Amino acid sequence: MSDELNYVDWFRHSSPYINAHRGKTLVILIPGEAFESPNFSNIIHDLALLDSLGIRLVLVQGARPQIDRALGNRRLSSRIEDGYRVTPQDQLIDVIQASSAVRVQLEAQLSMGLSNTPMANAGLRVCSGNYVVARPLGVVDGIDYGHSGEVRRIDRDAIFRLLEDDNMVLLPHLGFSPTGEVFNLKAEDVATQAAIQLKADKLIIFTEDEGIFDQKDELFSELLAHQADTILAQGSLSPETRNALEACLMAVRAQVPRSHIISFNENGGLLSELFTREGSGTMIDEDSYERLRLATIEDVGGMMQLLTPLEDKGILVRRSRELLENEIERFIVIERDGAIVACAALYPFEQERAGELACVAVSPEYRGSNRGERLLKGIEAEAKKQNLDTIFLLTTRTAHWFIERGFKETSLESLPAKKQALYNYQRNSKIFAKKL
């Protein structure tokens, strides 16, 4: 019974994260090493679960160990320079065959639908094709890379059509040129460019390591870009982990909101990273100097630090962490150097075409610099997107600030009926409204 209760508790706490990811696009790199992990079948089951939750998946497949084996079987040596495999003409066939075998293995696993397994009735559709246009690396520092190449572009329109038709898209590490040539690409480059050009919500890279560790061998659950730069400069990472971190860093600096490094050996690592507060690996985020954006589930901790002092003073109505998580899609935030310095929420009443402006808060050290104004404009823009005509608010302490920005005092009777029923007469808040 205790296990069942633990499961129910976990499922309840994960629901805000599930809602936050529904409809989002994730690019996930599965390296060749993952295919040989005892945990590989669990990864397949977790991908099927993500698909069933309405998450759009673009999978990128690597094949480094399989290529090494294929070359070894022919007693051919392989040369790696600056993280790229040199691919002479006589080795290209080995690369193609090894990559194709891995692709077929992945497609077969995703097609499985045996009863009494997690894949029962999954009905996954996996599409792959010539969606990666490539060009040769050429000769760099005197080294001829042969048929090794780099991503020129991703066929965004074709991939979007497949995703909209509920297909999972599979991109191998092979690219094709307009002249009909095949190029061996670095899988991390394919994943990074796919995430950037598709404007994906996340880039996720599986590695053997659980993530990035500090000098005390403790896992970083989150890294800002400048911290990642420092770690890369130290030169202490394995080549595979270094490739992964460089790819994640490039993605977030190109406006992919977040990137993640997780272990392909950890059972449930992907689900834990996406659907729990603690996660399982390392998340990499950009050092945004300051930006206004929609809140995400990862912002809840920072928002609580911002809101709790105001709640303690009675300025704001108290909200639990669970409530914030469940209502996270209502919030916008201002983020500065990775910290949440301001937030506000919009609660729409669609029938009355009105919206409540609530939970407006700016960190004390950042007040007086028009951040409240930016929040208000952001909420007004969001209200117009939702075809609302009016926004209203209840306040006990900040009436003049809103009056100066076009709000007018109104009566309780002017509020939507549901809001009237929730009015707290003990707080005796004043009511203000503004036509949009």
Q: What are the functions of these language-model segments?
A:
Residues 391-403, 408, 413-419:
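Conserved beta-strand-loop-alpha-helix junction that forms the acyl-donor binding cleft
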Residues 72-170:
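Ligand-binding beta-strand-loop-alpha-helix segment within the catalytic cores
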Residues 362, 368-385, 393:
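Conserved acetyl-CoA-binding loop-helix of GNAT-fold acetyltransferases
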Residues 40-43, 88-118, 156-157, 163, ...:
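Polyanion-binding loop/helix "lid" in catalytic or ligand-binding cores
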Residues 317-363:
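A conserved beta-strand-loop-helix scaffold within acyl/acetyltransferase catalytic domains
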Residues 287-317, 428-431:
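Short amphipathic alpha-helix that is part of the acyltransferase structural core
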Residues 1-58:
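N-terminal glycine-/serine-/threonine-rich phosphate-binding loop
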Residues 415-436:
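C-terminal "cap" of GNAT-fold acetyltransferases
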